[in-house]
Amino acid sequence: LYDTNYGLSESTGPGCVHLGMENIHKVGAIGVPGYRWECKIVDEEGNTVKQGDVGELCVKGPGLMTCYYNDPEATAQTLRDGWLFTGDMAMQDEDGFYFLVDRKKDVIVSGGENIYPVQIENFLSAYDKVKDVAVIGLPDKRLGEITGAIISVKDGMECTEEEIDAFCRELPRYKRPKKII
């Protein structure tokens, strides 16, 4: 058996839990809301998003902090209407399981599209020649930012930019790295 718990020091408890072997098909999930905990995912305006859409994960439950010590501004940004805004970007699947996507501040905005580097990093990590990868936002006059991928190739292997481009054809065009290093 295994279990995964998701929580923050500000929540002092498992906002989400993922227990038992019956959930093995939910690899990568942080789980479902823990006992007496609630979760929701919201957009930039604080509105709940549709299931399957990405937004900021908010948690509510026993053990939630009351404030940041001597920092009312940070408290007001993080705690709103009894909800803790975690700064974690997440999505909920059709079975109610939550998956972390990235940190809110790690978003690349390219031509008005939100791109989460960890999604592209996970995708590129599946390529058999890739040892490690980091995806970053690079300034672009027309689009604001473009994606760049810094790739470390496995020992004894060679990999061309063309190979990576071909592999990335499975990604939506706006998510494909425009610069490969």
Locate each region found by the language model.
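Gly/Ser/Thr-rich phosphate-binding loop
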Residues: L1-H25, E38, T48
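Active-site glycine-centered loops adjacent to acidic/histidine catalytic or metal-binding residues
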Residues: G7, G31, D88, G112
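Short beta-strand-to-turn element immediately C-terminal to the catalytic PLP-Schiff-base lysine
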Residues: C16-G20, V42-D43, K60, S152
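Conserved ATP/PPi-binding loop(s) of AMP-dependent carboxylate-activating enzymes
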Residues: V32-R36, N47-T78, E113-I115
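Conserved beta-loop-beta connector loops within the AMP-binding
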Residues: K40-C58, E94-D95, M157-E161
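AMP-binding/adenylate-forming catalytic core of the ANL superfamily
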Residues: G61, T66-C67, M89-R176
